[in-house]
């Protein structure tokens, strides 16, 4: 989701949320909020649900309830094409699911640490991507935190980061822009574990009626293919759940 040139919110989740609101027969108003304060502002009553690419994680479930997941997009590292980190082959794996505790997954983490030892990895603060680096790569990489994905993408392009870790979709968006022409993915796509169980809407624990309404709309939109069509329109591929 982002602001267009007219200052209006647009994006896959804006279209998704507007469609869900129409099906629920309610009028919804979008509110912008800095990421670091997004859950506290929900709990303070500034808005009634978070629809903002928030991954469903056990840590967040301690504070809020989540709707059924409606989108999922793995996380991946991106580097400059001329970087020594380009085209990393990590344990021969294209995808690493951290919910699996097998030898291949552990080997992949070990090889990733060895490849990126001493490098600066840039991530958005208070995200699952920061959590991954702190849990699995603490001490091996220098973690540089940013308030917004756009900021760390620009620093990657300028050579101030050796790599960034973010959602696949946000990196693709950057690579397709003028500023990201020299950027490429490297290594496998990560999911599970600290990356959670897909993207869902977050509501206050006491708001069970709101949760039920959204879950009904999400199920309907998943069944009839609406969410799939929205994600294909915005991401060029189906990342619906």
How should each PLM-predicted stretch be described?
Residues 11-24, 81-103, 120, 127, ...:
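Extended ligand-binding regions for polar small-molecule ligands
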Residues 26-29, 34-37, 55, 62, ...:
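A conserved helix-loop-strand patch within extracytoplasmic ligand-binding domains
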Residues 21-32, 115-117, 135-148, 160:
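A local structural motif
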Residues 1-54, 62:
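Extracytoplasmic small-molecule ligand-binding "clamshell" domains
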């Amino acid at each position: 989701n982002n602001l267009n040139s007219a200052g209006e919110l647009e994006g896959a989740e804006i279209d998704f949320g507007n469609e869900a609101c129409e099906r629920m027969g309610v009028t919804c108003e979008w509110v912008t909020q800095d990421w670091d304060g997004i859950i506290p502002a929900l709990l303070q009553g500034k808005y009634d649900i978070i629809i903002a690419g928030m991954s469903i994680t056990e840590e967040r479930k301690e504070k809020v309830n989540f709707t059924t997941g409606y989108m999922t997009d793995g996380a991946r590292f991106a580097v400059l094409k001329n970087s020594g980190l380009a085209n990393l082959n990590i344990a021969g794996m294209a995808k690493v699911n951290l919910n699996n505790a097998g030898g291949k997954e552990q080997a992949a983490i070990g090889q990733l640490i060895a490849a990126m030892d001493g490098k600066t990895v840039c991530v958005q603060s208070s995200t699952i991507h920061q959590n991954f680096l702190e849990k699995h790569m603490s001490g091996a990489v220098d973690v540089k935190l940013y308030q917004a994905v756009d900021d760390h993408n620009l620093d990657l392009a300028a050579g101030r980061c050796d790599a960034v870790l973010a959602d696949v979709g946000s990196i693709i968006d950057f690579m397709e822009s003028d500023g990201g022409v020299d950027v490429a993915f490297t290594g496998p796509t990560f999911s599970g574990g600290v990356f959670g169980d897909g993207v869902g809407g977050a509501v206050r624990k006491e708001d069970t009626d709101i949760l039920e309404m959204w879950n009904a709309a999400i199920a309907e939109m998943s069944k009839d293919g609406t969410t799939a069509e929205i994600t294909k329109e915005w991401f060029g591929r189906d990342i619906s759940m």
